[in-house]
Every structure is written in C-alpha cells, then in structure tokens.
Amino acid sequence: PHPRFLHSFPTRRSSDLIKAVVALRSVKEACEIEEIDLACNIGYEMHTAAMRLCKPGVKEQYIAGVLDGIASSYGSMTSFATILTQHGETLHNHDHSHILEVGRMMLTDAGAERLSNYCSDHTRTVPVGGKFQGRQKDVYNIVLACHDKALEIARPGITYMSVHQEVCKVLAQGLKDLGLMKGNIDEAVAAGAHALFLPHGLGHMMGLDVHDMEDLGQIYVGYDDEVRPSSQFGLASLRMGRRLQEGFVITDEPGCYFIPALIDKWRAEKMHTDFLNYDAIDKFKDFGGIRLEDDILITPEGSRFTGEKRIPITIKEVEAIMNE
C-alpha cells in the first residue's frame, strides 16, 4: 500500500481486538484438530527417521536435512527451523555442525507445517548409538515422569501455570533422589531453585503458528486478568499460564539441562545453596540436556495426544526403534 494510505491508520494496537482474535483462535474446531493431527503424523515420520539415523559418525546436518526432505515429501515444510544437536544444554541450538559421538544424546525439536499452515511440534532426546547409559537413564526417566505428570493433570479448568509448578516438583524430587538437589521440595520450587535445570516453561499454544498467536502478544495468548506472568527466572519464560479449556492444543515439553555457564554463575553467586548440591551438580557439566515434547488436545475429561501414533518415548520404545 502507498505510505500515505498507511498513515491514515492509527498506530495504537487495539487490546479489545487482540483479545477477540485470541478467543476465536484458542479453541480449535474439529477441522482444525484434523489438520493438526495430520501435521503430527508427518512429525512422527520425521522423528522416527531421526532416531534410526542417530549413529556415531553421522553429521547432525545430514539428519536435519533428511527431516526437511520428509516434510517436503508430504507436500509440507518444517514448521520452524529444526533444532537437532548433541549439545541439548544449549536451548534453541540451530548449529548442526557436529559429528555425533558415542556417550552423547541427540536432542531433536522439529515439526511439520501443512499447506493449511497448521503445525506440529515435538521433541525427543535419544542416545547416540541406540542404548541409554547409567545416568542418561536416570535423568531421562525424571523428564519422562515430568511429561507424564502434565498429561495426568491437564484438563479443563486447571491453570497451566499450576500444571507447570506440579511438574517442577516432580523434577526437583527426581533430582533430589539423585543427590543434585536437597531440602524441602515445595520450598525449593517456590524459590525457583529447580530453574537451574529447567529455565523455560512447560508449554505454549499450538495451531496456525508453532507458538500460536505469539505475535499478538503472549500476555494476551497465555495469560488473562486472572493469571498473570511471573518475573521469577524460569517461570517468567512460561508462555502459557491461564486456565485450560476444552479444544485448546498446547505443548507439554519439560526438560532437564546442565548448562555449565549457568551452573558456574549460580555457584559463584551462592544461589539457592539450601537446595542445590553444587559439588554433585558439577559432575554433570558434560551431560548435555534432555527435553521431551508432545502436542496435546484438551478434551472434556482431560487430554489426548494429537496424531494417529505417539512418537516412541519410553526407553524401551526408543531403544527398540533405534536398533531395528
């Protein structure tokens, strides 16, 4: 449009209009859910291919390219720039330059976007070489328990902020059992000590965008007059906090990351020493990171996975498909 035409419009954003759009797009109709299911079916093919290709000596970029090709072969495209890395401790790591090494884990956060623009978004973390080792099993099962806790309690009427906080308690208890955290779990989570390992939120809206409607402002999409965002480290990154409604499609994506620079910073600043066992944590600095993510539909009774088949997620399922 001609600049003079654009100048005739007010520069202010209408919060009432934004709220109306959010209300319309938040609850998905049956035809929208069908499109998301189809996108998730493509995501299944992408992630299972990545698992089969995850072998020592393979370059990350090769696997990432294969995932792009799978999406394209279904007449779709990736729904965002694929994250595929053996350095999962770096969040949103788009560097695919490494050669996969035995003893590391490959984190793949990838999805498909159909021509209708409806998206999928899944994450799996698998052991290079196809077999989980000692402490990998321990941390993986903690993250899986967090993931399953969210599925267990997510339902209409509950706030996703409260789901996030319950998941954080599962994480903290698991890390306490490993000797990495200590003290009262409820107090540790309230203080935000667990955020050393989980510096992001549990999930976000899904739909026409991977982070659906994020451009309208997360304060309108994930929050409302009742549930307000927090300023606490970690919890401040929760994109979706408000009460769930039937028809919402959201992500469930807990993680556990050992970020050397963050560990060193917190230790130097004596952060949460009542709850964190830094001597034990230091031994995990070379661990990397784990995230497990599914897209879920809020139903009248609770929630369900989107897509026809769930991407392998238990240790037994993952090892089986990696060693076919």
What positions do the PLM features span?
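Single conserved hydrophobic/aromatic residue that forms the stacking wall/gate
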Residues: 1-11
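Active-site neighborhoods and metal-handling regions in enzymes and metal-associated proteins
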Residues: 12-324
